[in-house]
């Protein structure tokens, strides 16, 4: 169905493949997508705050004609998906990996379609518990429910067991098969295989860390593996940026050599070193020579001092907080 609102075929393709909901036998038109967005916002504002959108017709026409755009994440999820969880309305987020709960929270947020910036810096990873020295197979079975919360809960329960030195079984029989339509969120199910792969990966990673804390690189790898299970219609759908210590050589070379063969999950994140002050010339050259040698263009730069200066100029938050960033990192640009 040709849509006359878009100047190019590419724009029309992006709408149909990313934002148009399935209506039983066809996808939404652009006009129907925009109407769904405004219906949801109008109804929500009236129900919760007794507020009606002024000049709705004028605003709707501005979006239809591509003069302005609302939150594209909300444009995609407006309706039952966004009504169930407002996480689905956010484009991006940030979390330091300083607690075991960070892993299942990242899984849940990514499944809601929200990008995740995370820090695997030593100052955060050092807060994680020590992994048990010994592991034993148990009869405990984690029953994973067929929902975003169910997947996240399953990972949380597995990690809790592993910290206690127990290797449980898991039951994924309740998950819908690959290709089944996701009526609320849209797209099609990946089936249980990606989650099963993640749970096995997690067990092996913890066994290799027996008797010590997870290293920053292991935290990074686990988050990247988590992102790899976010599959919609056979397409990977997750956005990550990983922040790491400037002096971490293991993170510096994480995408060097044939990493794409041995550690393909690392391709799910862009990697950036955190600069908290001007580095000495030796450190600077070492980092940039590594970037050149990697042929991957990484690691990039996240200037934490610049982020703090930006916050100070806005006078709305504590500028001494150790800020991270969202995957695009445009939030600190002037």
What are these regions (language model features)?
Residues 1-334:
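Extended catalytic cores of very large enzyme megasubunits
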């Amino acid at each position: 169905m040709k849509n006359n609102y878009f100047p190019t075929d590419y724009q029309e393709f992006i709408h149909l493949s990313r934002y148009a909901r399935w209506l039983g036998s066809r996808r939404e038109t652009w006009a129907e997508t925009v109407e769904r967005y405004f219906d949801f916002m109008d109804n929500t504002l009236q129900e919760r705050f007794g507020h009606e959108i002024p000049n709705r017709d004028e605003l709707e026409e501005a979006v239809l004609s591509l003069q302005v755009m609302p939150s594209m994440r909300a444009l995609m999820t407006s309706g039952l998906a966004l009504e169930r969880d407002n996480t689905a309305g956010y484009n991006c987020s940030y979390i330091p990996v300083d607690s075991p709960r960070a892993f299942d929270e990242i899984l849940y947020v990514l499944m809601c379609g929200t990008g995740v910036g995370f820090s695997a810096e030593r100052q955060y990873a050092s807060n994680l518990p020590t992994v048990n020295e010994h592991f034993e197979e148990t009869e405990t079975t984690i029953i994973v429910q067929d929902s975003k919360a169910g997947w996240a809960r399953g990972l949380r329960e597995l990690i809790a067991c592993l910290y206690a030195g127990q290797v449980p079984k898991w039951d994924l029989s309740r998950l819908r098969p690959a290709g089944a339509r996701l009526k609320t969120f849209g797209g099609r199910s990946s089936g249980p295989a990606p989650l099963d792969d993640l749970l096995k990966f997690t067990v092996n990673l913890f066994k290799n860390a027996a008797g010590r804390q997870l290293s920053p690189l292991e935290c990074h790898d686990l988050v990247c593996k988590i992102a790899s299970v976010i599959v919609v219609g056979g397409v990977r759908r997750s956005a990550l940026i990983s922040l790491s210590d400037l002096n971490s050589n293991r993170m510096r070379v994480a995408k060097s050599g044939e990493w794409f063969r041995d550690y393909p999950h690392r391709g799910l994140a862009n990697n950036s070193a955190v600069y908290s002050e001007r580095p000495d010339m030796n450190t600077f050259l070492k980092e940039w020579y590594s970037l050149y040698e990697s042929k991957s263009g990484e690691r990039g730069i996240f200037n934490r001092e610049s982020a703090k200066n930006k916050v100070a100029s806005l006078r709305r938050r504590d500028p001494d907080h150790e800020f991270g960033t969202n995957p695009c990192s445009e939030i600190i640009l002037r």
